[in-house]
Amino acid sequence: SNADAGVALVLARPQGAATGTRGLSLFLLPARLPDGRANRYRIVRLKDKLGTRAMPSGEIILEGATAYMVGDPERGFVQMADMINMSRLSNGMRAAGLMRRALTEALFIARGRDAFGQPLIHLPLMRRQLLKIMLAAESARTITFRTALELAQADAGDSAARLRVRLLTPLLKFRACRDARRAAGDAMEVRGGAGYIEEWSDARVLRDAHLGSIWE
């Protein structure tokens, strides 16, 4: 992901290292070398993705590229696992944000769009649908803030908080990312057929929402 980034973190096995995950080390791969020359790797292709199109994902080929080891040798997999855990947290936060955007759009439309001689937001079934989106968005935001608090306490040396973070992070990622897919679809319906048009944000939010439960 983010194939055109200035730096990338990659796992590689140094010569003579052990087999399996224990022999992997973490390396920093810059796009350009200190003298300004491009590093020796090529982006072979960019992937035609359903969503998150603003962040290009691609395949690269290393051609004698220069990279710098990060941390202790042969602990790359452990370091990458820590990064993946943080990425799971960010996925949950991202899902919470997507639902908040979907809810904001849905409420705006429900207040301004009329049906049966009155605004949509006055109709009981529409209120029920909006409430479902709101509950999912609020629960995701609440657990996101709680997990962030526990993470700050864990970084300060609280061992009990560290254990809670290990539990909360996958729960947030699983629940929020699943809820975001449903919430994005329900919010699109509030705008009607216009929500299916790329001129509005609903289509992009819906596409992006489906990635969270797949990543990490």
Predicted regions span which residues?
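Flexible loop/turn segments at secondary-structure boundaries
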Residues: 1, 17-19, 34-37, 68-69, ...
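Short Gly/Pro-enriched turn/cap motifs at secondary-structure boundaries
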Residues: 1, 18, 49-56
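A short core secondary-structure module
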Residues: 1-40
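Composition- and surface-driven signal marking solvent-exposed, interaction-prone regions
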Residues: 2-10, 23, 76, 95-96, ...
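Active-site lining segments that contact anionic ligands and/or coordinate catalytic metals
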Residues: 4-7, 21-24, 38, 55-59, ...
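Short beta-turn/strand-loop junction motif enriched in small, turn-promoting residues
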Residues: 13-17, 48-49, 67, 211
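A glycine-rich, basic-preceded beta-loop-alpha segment at the flavin cofactor/substrate interface
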Residues: 32-40, 44, 49, 56-87, ...
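Alpha-helical interface subdomain recognition
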Residues: 61, 88-216
